[in-house]
A protein has these predicted regions:
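Extended serine/threonine-enriched, polar tracts that run as long, contiguous segments within proteins
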Residues: 88-149
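OB-fold ssDNA-binding interfaces and closely related basic DNA-contact patches used
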Residues: 1-100, 140-142, 146-152
Length: 153
């Protein structure tokens, strides 16, 4: 698949209601009725900055670009009084088993992804052109994501 082939998929993904990939210490959950998986193969369509404001462990505001809130696009993150309480994240738009999924990475998983993406970029690999393995390391109360290349061509 040529990396330009994913552009129409990106456009569709940003316009539809997307399911979120759930990360647990036991693994990745693609659908609420499925058991956690230790690893999945994925195509990464896009990534970028995101922010989520949590109250009592529930998201109350989210931005998928770090600029404006999803629920109220006129609400600018830069001017929001709650900005300091937001969790900075990395947004991944994925295709896993022909399903469009979104994953929001915070802290360690975000760092792992950004280091992985920088390594690919340094090696001249377009992240959209290859298959990736995403695996979970059990950290007790949370799951840390690790990224590796499956398709080096």
């Amino acid at each position: 698949m040529d990396y330009r082939d994913v552009e129409p998929l990106r456009e569709i993904l940003h316009r539809v209601l997307v399911r979120y990939l759930t990360v647990t210490p036991a693994g990745l959950i693609l659908d609420k009725d499925e058991r956690p998986r230790a690893k999945v193969e994925a195509r990464i369509l896009s990534f970028g900055g995101a922010r989520t404001l949590y109250r009592k462990r529930k998201p109350v505001c989210r931005s998928l670009d770090g600029v404006a809130a999803v629920t109220d696009p006129s609400k600018a993150c830069a001017e929001c009084e709650d900005r300091q309480r937001c969790t900075p994240q990395v947004r991944l738009d994925l295709i896993v088993e022909q399903r469009a999924l979104r994953c929001l990475l915070a802290f360690t998983s975000a760092r792992n992804f950004l280091e992985y993406e920088a390594r690919l970029r340094r090696d001249g690999v377009f992240i959209e052109q290859v298959l990736h393995q995403i695996s979970v390391v059990d950290r007790g109360t949370w799951g840390e994501l690790r990224f590796s290349l499956l398709d080096p061509s």
